[in-house]
Amino acid sequence: RHPHVFGDGTAATVSQVRAAWQTIKQQEKPARASQLEGIPKALPELARAARLSSRAALVGYDFPDRLMLFEKLREELGELAVELFGTPELPVVIPSAETAAVPDEPWTDAARRERAESELGDVLFAVANIARRWGINPEEALRKTNARFTRRFQAIETAVRESGRTLQQVSLPEMESIYQAYKRREQGRADASADTQ
């Protein structure tokens, strides 16, 4: 399968090597009905999205410039905003006592909720595609973010408990202040660790 190394083939670029590799693999394997066959449905969905877009890219269905993926993400966020807010413009929210007291609206229109879910799926697919193009595992990125959030939220719980109060007795701005302080401490430890290496 490596004619550019062991045979008569030549390949000047990495993309030419990959294209030749795919051609040889397709000749050796039975024909697939779809380029997307063989991607396990049991994969976590972010990983599956990255794999689907990777397979499509192998046959040229990809943005020629990876920066275009951010424009696609903006487009998808705009479409989600239309379903959520009735406008493609993302709202700018300035926190205040009034906005903090407004409860989330329950979905009253099932069709609109379904469209919003579809648009959110498109946003997540675009994010997985960005991860793929930059060589980032989206599942690993999300796992690390979940772990960071857990540590930081638990820091809020600890600080509140040590103050003799419950979470329900603490304002959102105070909780956010504790969260951000813990985040700065974590980043300071990471910076100090990097300096010693």
What label would you give each PLM region?
Residues R1-L120, F125-Q197:
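Flexible "arm" and connector segments at domain edges
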